[in-house]
Amino acid sequence: MRVLLAPMEGVLDSLVRELLTEVNDYDLCITEFVRVVDQLLPVKVFHRICPELQNASRTPSGTLVRVQLLGQFPQWLAENAARAVELGSWGVDLNCGCPSKTVNGSGGGATLLKDPELIYQGAKAMREAVPAHLPVSVKVRLGWDSGEKKFEIADAVQQAGATELVVHGRTKEQGYRAEHIDWQAIGEIRQRLNIPVIANGEIWDWQSAQQCMAISGCDAVMIGRGALNIPNLSRVVKYNEPRMPWPEVVALLQKYTRLEKQGDTGLYHVARIKQWLSYLRKEYDEATELFQHVRVLNNSPDIARAIQAIDIDKLR
């Protein structure tokens, strides 16, 4: 099976990709989105979102990375897709699933689900702009407020010439509510298409991955939030390995505090460490205590000192 690391805006950036791919076996990472409006973006924008472009589109541990674009205008999606692959991206991905109100208000992300023709035109323009040997993928949800257009959306992606389709098994309006996940609908799309379909949504452990694949018939999954809950989730999902022990999680957090974010004004680790701990609390009781300890800290050096001060040997 293939396991992909999902794009998560404001969460899974290049530093987190570096950490997670070092302790996992991901087949591919998709970047946070590059927002495309009405211009060809400068090279520095692509390098900021995807510094791996300067390493043959791979993380330091060797996992492939693909740039994701978000926008609605085919011409500019095409030009920026061409630039992404010229800079070394291993193909490009089109975001048609982001449920953010800000993103949707500007006509991008899940808004495209309302009009599958827009998805077709955007994906087709990107496909024509990218050399045939490089993949063009599209990430969608089942629809905006219902799944009525799910087949029309899927057909648009395939007819546009996309290489593969990632389907998040909920509508935009359903957000991330667990009770609404519909792996069966993903399976219906998979049966309809000739291109590979990758299942996404509510994959938290080996059991849920097996259930998702059994119901959908997909042999590839994309994981997002779960990858933060259990830092070695791809190995759990692929090989039924146990979750990472807490001392190893702390060691990973310590390494995270030593990584420098370009352009950081001293607040990056404050937000990101607290954010990651809020995910870890769902799986590790120890993360709750650590979160309470650092939640009052408001600058990166203090956060780093607090995390670095933990004696891992005493946790074993």
UniProtKB/Swiss-Prot annotation:
NCBIfam families: PRK10550.1 (NF007838). GO terms for molecular function: flavin adenine dinucleotide binding; FMN binding; tRNA binding; tRNA-dihydrouridine16 synthase activity. Catalyzes the synthesis of 5,6-dihydrouridine (D), a modified base found in the D-loop of most tRNAs, via the reduction of the C5-C6 double bond in target uridines. Specifically modifies U16 in tRNAs. Its cofactor is FMN. PROSITE patterns: UPF0034. PANTHER family: TRNA-DIHYDROURIDINE SYNTHASE, TRNA-DIHYDROURIDINE(16) SYNTHASE. The record marks R35, N95, Y176, R272, K274, Y279, R295 as: Interacts with tRNA. This is tRNA-dihydrouridine(16) synthase. The keyword tRNA processing applies. The active site is at C98. FMN binds at P7, M8, E9, Q68, K139, N200, G201, E202, G224, R225. It catalyses: 5,6-dihydrouridine(16) in tRNA + NADP(+) = uridine(16) in tRNA + NADPH + H(+); 5,6-dihydrouridine(16) in tRNA + NAD(+) = uridine(16) in tRNA + NADH + H(+). It is an enzyme of class 1 (oxidoreductase). Pfam families: Dus. SUPFAM superfamilies: FMN-linked oxidoreductases. InterPro entries: Aldolase_TIM (IPR013785), DUS-like_FMN-bd (IPR035587), DUS_fam (IPR001269), DusC (IPR032886), DusC_C (IPR042270), tRNA_hU_synthase_CS (IPR018517). It comes from the Bacteria. Signal peptide: none annotated.
